[in-house]
Amino acid sequence: ILVNVLIGLGLLVLLALTFAPLESLGWWAREGADEAAATVQELAAIDSGPDDSAYDGYVVYLSGIGAVGGDSVPPEELPLIQNLSSRLTRLKVIHDVFPYSVSNNGLTAQRPTAAVWRWVEKLRFKNPETLAGMLINARNAMQLFVCADRRYGPAYNVGTAQEVMRALRRHGYPMGSGLPVTLIGWSGGAQISIGAA
């Protein structure tokens, strides 16, 4: 029985790895290529503008593989974000980008599998050591593999970079000001920040 369970788990992992790039490839085919071209044109047209920001720079934080959405930071990461915000008072710390989706669409947000991910998240809150909670980590790790893949990574990284830019705008970043932007991340978020840069 143990051998059958291990074979079944292996097949599930293989199947999940096979489907992992589909979100970013679907996004690229539907809208990503057009959005990327428009963004390049928009950025080329921006003149240096006045620095009318209340901050000396911006820090965009990308969560680790335990995240379920941009609006939900894993509890173990909160002290780091709070520490950054309290110590770097002249910098705006942004932490509402979900790095494991090219469209910043959290697992529990508007997607066909949202109910499943809400159930898994509820189990994880009740018992952080539950095997079901590891499904979130596994799913996000597979997106991390997509980010690092030479075939699918470029599309994934463009999508993430666009979401970072949208977050900067939402938080008042003056485009064309030349204010520094620093990307940092926890665990897989650090890897994805390299691709988005």
Segments and roles (model prediction):
Residues I1-L43:
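N-terminal membrane-anchoring alpha-helices
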Residues W27-W28, Y61-V68, E77-G176:
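Active-site catalytic motif of lipid deacylating hydrolases and related acyltransferases
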Residues L43-S53, Y173-M175:
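Short boundary motifs at domain starts and secondary-structure transition points
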Residues D51-D52, P74-E77:
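Electropositive, gly/pro-rich neighborhoods at or near active sites that engage anionic ligands
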Residues D51-V59, L179:
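A short, charged/proline- and glycine-enriched loop
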Residues V60-Y61, L183:
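Hydrophobic Val/Ile/Leu positions in short beta-strands of Rossmann-like dinucleotide-binding domains
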Residues I184-G189, S193:
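Gly/Ala-rich beta-loop-alpha elbow adjacent to hydrolase catalytic centers
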Residues A197:
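The feature captures the conserved acid-bearing segment of alpha/beta-hydrolase catalytic domains
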